[in-house]
Amino acid sequence: MKICVLFGGPHKNGNTAKLLAKVLDGAKSQGHSVELFHLVDMDIRPCKGCMACKKPKANGCVQKDDMVKIYEPLRQCDLLILASPMYWWNLAGPLKDAVDRFFAMPFAAGREQSIFAGKKLMLVMTSGQAAEHDGREGLELILQKMCQFTGMTWLGTVTAGTNDKSLDEQPQVLEKAYAIGAGL
């Protein structure tokens, strides 16, 4: 299976990165390939809402930034993983900008040939709250709606709360993340 990962966190060695690494280690142990994009290191501008990408004979987004490096891996992947710390009950800004730019691709199942149809979507998320109180329900609902609209299958969220303990102090959470990755 081909896995495309959009990592929106600002810290390459932070809690979200550690949780994601365990999921990906598990996936790689089963022979899955991974392409990881560290969005904070890329020049990805927000969607301008210009609608140029939806005009007849349009060829994607008119903004020629680093998002062009992501479009083809998105087309080719079987699983898309969005990885982010929770910021104000949402994705971190760089990841939200990239997801908004999906608009330039054929995405609406039933209305056009969705490049997302048949793919799977997973969220890997950390927050400063205990996992049972992290408030992710609203974000999960948005991603579930995105799956319905695009023809993707929602796999759920791998999450960890880090309010009182870093992930290094929660080996059981990291073991579970590895097992989830190995089960993909």
Question: Residue locations for each model-derived region?
Answer:
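N-terminal beta1-alpha1-beta2 submodule of the flavodoxin-like/Rossmannoid cofactor-binding fold
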Residues: 1-83, 87-104, 108-112, 162-184
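Short, glycine-/small-residue-rich phosphate/pyrophosphate-handling segment
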Residues: 94, 107-155
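Beta-strand-loop-alpha "switch" segments that mediate conformational coupling across diverse proteins
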Residues: 156-160
